[in-house]
Amino acid sequence: MSHLDNGFRSLTLQRFPATDDVNPLQAWEAADEYLLQQLDDTEIRGPVLILNDAFGALSCALAEHKPYSIGDSYISELATRENLRLNGIDESSVKFLDSTADYLQQPGVVLIKVPKTLALLEQQLRALRKVVTSDTRIIAGAKARDIHTSTLELFEKVLGPTTTTLAWKKARLINCTFNEPPLADAPQTVSWKLEGTDWTIHNHANVFSRTGLDIGARFFMQHLPENLEGEIVDLGCGNGVIGLTLLDKNPQAKVVFVDESPMAVASSRMNVETNMPEALDRCEFMINNALSGVEPFRFNAVLCNPPFHQQHALTDNVAWEMFHHARRCLKINGELYIVANRHLDYFHKLKKIFGNCTTIATNNKFVVLKTVKLGRRR
């Protein structure tokens, strides 16, 4: 846990999933402080929109103003809810909208934590363009190193005149005034042909490796199991290419596509509808934090390309949680397959959780691992 003192309220905040005490990661950053410094209670008039509030620092601080929190992370929503409870703030103080929803009209203040991907930022700025006015105060913040010329140019192109502040604690802010500059329409998704198939893959803005198949997934697809039956999971499904391949290779199986990103789940659904519509009755689509709330002993197999970062931080906490959830939800003798960068040493982590692990394939960068849920371990 960490403490954030600001002009609105003193907060105790924690990350979600929680980090260990040996290598703790903070649930807020200097950009959050800097953004809050720019606001004074007397000048907040009209609805407050907060975009990409990773762990709820901004939403908790401004809870009295009933803000709307918008993002493409269900984990961020869970983190915000947890931090509201931790600080004794009514959860209903913050309204949550996912990245595919329409934004509230005529907001008084918009606070943006600049996301990692320029594509997501553009999608969000285009959505804001439909609802903000020239009186809306628009402020964005990030680490100074993450604000580039291309970032400022995007604000200028979509919304209007843009300036940036001096750096403070290695953070920088962007101030923007809406004047409705001319702007050509842009598609909601990008699409590309998946080599070796007849499939066209469609990706929403925040999907990993948006413009082509990432090399880890490419390697994983060469080693996916065949002839499985029952329910299997594409955990952290992204655009769903792994799940699509599983549907194709396992015609007797049902595939559950799971991701914490609403855009990822929407992309997966679109890709099944476009490329294998006849298999839709063998699919389930779920926005979730790994397999939280899913009943134990449900699945015959789980397949996963786990992330090793959360927001801008490198961490294996999300992967570790995925592995534990997979073990709980697998049937006895159910199998977990993962692909990962070799340097992450997931072999020993999986062996610690499951009691066994086998290397299926390896190259100079990636490894495909398999582990089995044995009945003797609880």
UniProtKB/Swiss-Prot annotation:
Subcellular localization, per the record?
A: Cytoplasm
Highest taxon in the source lineage:
Bacteria
Reactions mediated catalytically: guanosine(1835) in 23S rRNA + S-adenosyl-L-methionine = N(2)-methylguanosine(1835) in 23S rRNA + S-adenosyl-L-homocysteine + H(+)
Q: What is its EC number?
A: 2.1.1.174
The terms under GO molecular function for this entry are: 23S rRNA (guanine(1835)-N(2))-methyltransferase activity; nucleic acid binding
Q: Name one Pfam family in it.
A: MTS
Keywords, ordered alphabetically:
Cytoplasm, Methyltransferase, rRNA processing, S-adenosyl-L-methionine, Transferase
Top EC category: transferase
**GO cellular component assignments:** cytoplasm
| Disulfide bond in keyword set | no
Protein purpose? Specifically methylates the guanine in position 1835 (m2G1835) of 23S rRNA.
- The identity of this protein, by name, is Ribosomal RNA large subunit methyltransferase G
Organism of origin is Escherichia coli O9:H4 (strain HS)
This chain is encoded by the gene named: rlmG
